[in-house]
């Protein structure tokens, strides 16, 4: 059981980690080291011996091992990432890097993804140290860099260059592994993450005929691009069920007394309520336009 001090530390650590701006815009501009040092200091306070590891200066990862009571048991990896996606202060009612506690809530970028979990990991380990608690199995604790971009400086680097640190790990709990599904009826579902969706980035470029904004132009590059982007955003890709997803759908259907229909998953998704968005992303590919850029002057049609 968590003591009150551990609960207070979760709030404190979340707030303080948020105040360390680790925005990852891609391109290697992020610096997680201050947050990594913060986490390492608190791990050391729990009697652990954390390692700080970098592929690129400033892109720091933290790894520590908690010895379990049963050396024959498989180890468990518990991990979180230290970087966050960027935030524009003008879009927030509370500054995104203030870590302000208001109305019983911690506000800021990372409060959900995922400095909150980083803080919980740290607080639990420190609480165990105070209470003299040891887990049955070894725990490998990892706080990684670069999750919000390529992961080349984070988990990719650790897996490629330091696999020995994860020796014996057979399962992991992280941002999505052991994620709880809530279907809106009070039912809690605990899925097992067996893999990740692949990712591809595409750049779509449209050309046209340049001209003055006061004249009709049926070869407008902006409207051509907008039409293409709309089609991409509205397109529903066909079902594509991997063997792992089929197994998951079979188990989910059984929870509701249904037979899994691999040709029509709509009924099952409807049963899942709020959790449907998480499951729907596993049954088909998807494409989302995220950035647009066009023109250079308000009265000039770009070519």
Describe the role of every protein-language-model region:
Residues 2-109, 118, 128-137:
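Acidic/His- and Gly-rich active-site-bordering loop/insert found
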Residues 112, 147, 208-214, 296:
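A generic structural motif
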């Amino acid at each position: 059981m968590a003591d009150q001090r551990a609960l207070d530390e979760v709030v404190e650590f979340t707030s303080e980690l948020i105040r360390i701006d680790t925005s990852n815009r891609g391109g290697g501009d992020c610096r997680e080291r201050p947050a990594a040092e913060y986490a390492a200091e608190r791990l050391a306070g729990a009697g652990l011996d954390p390692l700080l590891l970098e592929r690129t200066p400033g892109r720091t990862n933290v790894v520590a091992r908690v010895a379990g009571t049963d050396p024959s048991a498989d180890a468990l990896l518990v991990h979180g990432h230290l970087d966050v996606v960027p935030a524009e202060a003008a879009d927030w009612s509370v500054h995104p890097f203030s870590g302000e506690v208001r109305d019983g809530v911690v506000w800021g970028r990372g409060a959900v993804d995922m400095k909150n979990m980083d803080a919980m990991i740290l607080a639990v380990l420190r609480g165990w140290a105070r209470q003299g608690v040891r887990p049955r199995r070894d725990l490998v604790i990892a706080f990684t860099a670069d999750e919000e971009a390529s992961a080349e400086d984070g988990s990719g680097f650790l897996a490629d260059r330091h696999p020995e640190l994860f020796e014996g790990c057979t399962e992991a709990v992280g941002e999505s592994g052991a994620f709880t599904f809530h279907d809106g009826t009070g039912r809690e579902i605990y899925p097992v993450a067996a893999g990740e969706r692949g990712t591809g980035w595409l750049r779509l470029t449209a050309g046209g005929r340049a001209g003055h904004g006061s004249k009709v132009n049926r070869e407008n590059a902006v409207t051509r691009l907008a039409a293409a982007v709309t089609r991409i955003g509205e397109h529903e890709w066909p079902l594509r069920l991997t063997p792992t997803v089929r197994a998951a759908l079979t188990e989910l259907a059984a929870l509701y007394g249904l037979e899994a229909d691999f040709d029509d998953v709509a009924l099952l998704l409807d049963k899942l309520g709020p959790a449907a968005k998480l499951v729907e992303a596993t049954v088909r590919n998807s494409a989302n336009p995220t950035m647009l850029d066009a023109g250079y002057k308000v009265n000039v049609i770009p070519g």
